[in-house]
């Protein structure tokens, strides 16, 4: 009750200050208007019109006096100080926003005022609009912007950052600045969230946050991914330290492995960490979150300590674990586990697909943000907590021609691990059995008139048909369905797009100009280049058969063979072998078979 009264008082105080500013502006404008010559001339003319007898006689005299007064004012104006222009209240607020550095194009993302470490800032930047708060101007910036939430990471209190040691008695000014931000947010009805992603001074958790989340922001797949990883990785295992305290036993195990020559240490900065993981075959860590990031980059992880997680036992994300206790120092379990993981090599393509699917669906940064923001109450008129997931929405387009094709399409869509936002079909297919089945399942559906359903030479719809369907799609992505691809079809292509930032994803095909170039040069260099990437996934290529593309790109109606000439980034991702076969529990993982 006390916080609610404080919130209402703060809102009334802010409204009163705004009204006073507007009143002062109106009074200044009124005074300037009453003192203007134009108004006095108008009054003289009005008085003369009301009393024509006397008014017309006095009008020349009154106008002459105004003229003399105006001339005297202009002559003496040079020796007097010019009056300051009347400043608008809206102009004052726009100037404050400009000085705060927060002028920019608005978008559909949530607006978050952040006290964040550089790593957390880079992780959430693609999914929310971050307005960074600094200790020296936190109050000015926060008062000049409208935000949906306040997000504070404990890692921002690390040494060397702007908010270093916030919450510590030695940094009372920074703690007071952050406390003011949290209380001001509460007075507006804006939730404030603390991410306990690193050890922090205890006073930080005592601030009146709306929510304290134990953990980080998940795995940012746009940073930790296997995109363009070299086929040949370093074979020597590498140890990456965690942010928190590893423990005495874990540190001694690492020291023993390094002393025996089985392990090398690496301590890259947060910016170089993804490249280090992509270049490694085996990674030794003591943090489960770091193990997930290593496996998302294609490396095999050995986790020191931690209890098995039953939720990830069947997803390929169960790394080999070594218990961290006193017996591990004398049993040699760490060396044996490292030898097994090292012998297994990096993750296979099937294992990597399973890992990326699991991370994409459960622990990627947009999923974690939606979960965290969904646990607080937003102020009326704010954005949706699930706004970070909008960039994943996909519209599935297809051109079924008969009942057999439509039933195959319906079966493929209904078993997808990641449900589409909508389905876009040409008009006149409502009578097909598969379309009726999709409607009965409650999937949103759109139909488009005038779609050319004639197939091209390869038996698939042409670019004009896909473009007509994409023009009616409302999602940022369009999936082009041609044949059944399995339950993980949408998950795989959307995950690849999120990892790479590509404009289109699909199997690599020979570039349309490679044959001509080869015949002209006589050396087949272009054809050799196509063959080099034909069997590789998660690499950028010259041409693909698109399975997923940005809606704006498909709407242009271009042949996919020339998309790269128009600036599109094309990522190769072939179909997963045995897509319809369900993985057996424990079949794929980071622990090799004992036999």
Residue positions per predicted region:
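Boundary detector for helix-to-coil junctions that initiate low-complexity/charged tails
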Residues: 1-90
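Short beta-strand-to-loop acidic/aromatic patch adjacent to the donor-nucleotide binding site
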Residues: 467-490
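C-terminal catalytic/acceptor-binding lobe
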Residues: 272-274, 345, 351-354, 528, ...
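Nucleotide-sugar donor-binding catalytic core of glycosyltransferases
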Residues: 84-141, 213-297, 307-308, 313
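Short, acidic, metal-binding catalytic loop of nucleotide-sugar glycosyltransferases
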Residues: 411-420
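Catalytic core of nucleotide-activated saccharide and alditol-phosphate transferases
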Residues: 176-261, 336, 340-344, 352, ...
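Catalytic binding pocket for nucleotide-activated donors in carbohydrate/polymer assembly enzymes
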Residues: 205, 257-260, 264-362, 366, ...
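Conserved catalytic core of nucleotide-sugar-dependent glycosyltransferases
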Residues: 487-562
């Amino acid at each position: 009750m006390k916080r609610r009264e404080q919130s209402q008082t703060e809102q009334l105080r802010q409204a009163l200050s705004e009204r006073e500013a507007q009143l002062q502006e109106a009074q200044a404008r009124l005074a300037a208007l009453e003192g203007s010559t134009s108004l006095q001339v108008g009054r003289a003319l009005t008085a003369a019109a009301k009393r024509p007898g006397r008014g017309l006689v006095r009008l020349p005299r009154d106008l002459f006096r105004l003229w003399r007064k105006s001339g005297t004012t202009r002559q003496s104006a040079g020796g007097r100080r010019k009056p300051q222009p009347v400043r608008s209240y809206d102009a004052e607020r726009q100037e404050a926003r400009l000085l705060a550095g927060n002028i920019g194009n608005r978008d559909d993302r949530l607006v978050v005022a952040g006290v964040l470490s550089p790593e957390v800032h880079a992780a959430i930047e693609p999914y929310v609009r971050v307005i960074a708060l600094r200790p020296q101007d936190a109050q000015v910036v926060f008062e000049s912007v409208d935000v949906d939430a306040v997000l504070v990471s404990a890692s921002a209190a690390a040494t060397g950052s702007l908010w270093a040691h916030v919450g510590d008695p030695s940094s009372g000014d920074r703690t007071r600045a952050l406390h003011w931000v949290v209380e001001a947010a509460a007075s507006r009805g804006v939730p404030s969230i603390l991410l306990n992603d690193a050890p922090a001074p205890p006073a930080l958790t005592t601030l009146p946050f709306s929510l304290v989340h134990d953990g980080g922001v998940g795995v940012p797949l746009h940073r930790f991914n296997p995109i363009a990883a070299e086929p040949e990785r370093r074979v020597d295992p590498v140890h990456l330290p965690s942010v928190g305290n590893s423990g005495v036993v874990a540190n001694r195990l690492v020291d023993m492995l390094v002393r025996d020559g089985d392990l090398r240490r690496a301590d890259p900065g947060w910016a170089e960490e993804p490249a280090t993981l992509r270049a490694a075959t085996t990674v030794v860590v003591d943090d489960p979150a770091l193990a997930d990031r290593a496996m998302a980059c294609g490396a095999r992880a050995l986790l020191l300590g931690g209890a098995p997680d039953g939720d990830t036992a069947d997803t390929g994300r169960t790394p080999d674990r070594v218990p961290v206790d006193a017996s591990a120092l004398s049993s040699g379990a760490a060396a044996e586990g490292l030898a097994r993981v090292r012998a297994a090599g990096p993750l296979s393509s099937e294992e990597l697909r399973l890992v990326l699917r699991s991370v994409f669906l459960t622990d990627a940064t947009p999923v974690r943000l939606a979960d965290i923001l969904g646990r607080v109450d937003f102020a009326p008129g704010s954005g949706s907590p699930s706004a970070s997931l909008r960039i994943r929405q996909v519209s599935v387009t297809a051109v079924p021609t008969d009942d057999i094709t439509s039933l195959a399409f319906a079966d493929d869509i209904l078993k997808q691990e990641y449900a589409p936002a909508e389905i876009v079909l040409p008009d006149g297919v409502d009578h097909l059995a598969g379309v009726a089945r999709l409607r009965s399942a409650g999937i949103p559906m759109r139909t488009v008139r005038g779609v050319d359903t004639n197939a091209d030479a390869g038996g698939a719809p042409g670019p004009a048909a896909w473009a007509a369907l994409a023009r009616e799609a409302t999602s940022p992505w369009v999936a082009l369905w041609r044949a059944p691809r399995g339950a993980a079809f949408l998950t795989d292509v959307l995950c690849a797009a999120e990892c790479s930032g590509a404009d289109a994803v699909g199997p690599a095909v020979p570039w349309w100009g490679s044959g001509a170039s080869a015949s002209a040069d006589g050396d087949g260099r272009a054809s050799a280049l196509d063959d080099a990437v034909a069997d590789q996934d998660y690499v950028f290529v010259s041409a693909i058969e698109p399975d997923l593309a940005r809606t704006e790109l498909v709407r242009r109606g271009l042949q996919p063979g020339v998309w790269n000439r128009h600036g599109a980034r094309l990522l190769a991702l072939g179909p997963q072998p045995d897509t319809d076969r369900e993985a057996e529990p424990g079949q794929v993982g980071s622990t090799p078979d004992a036999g």
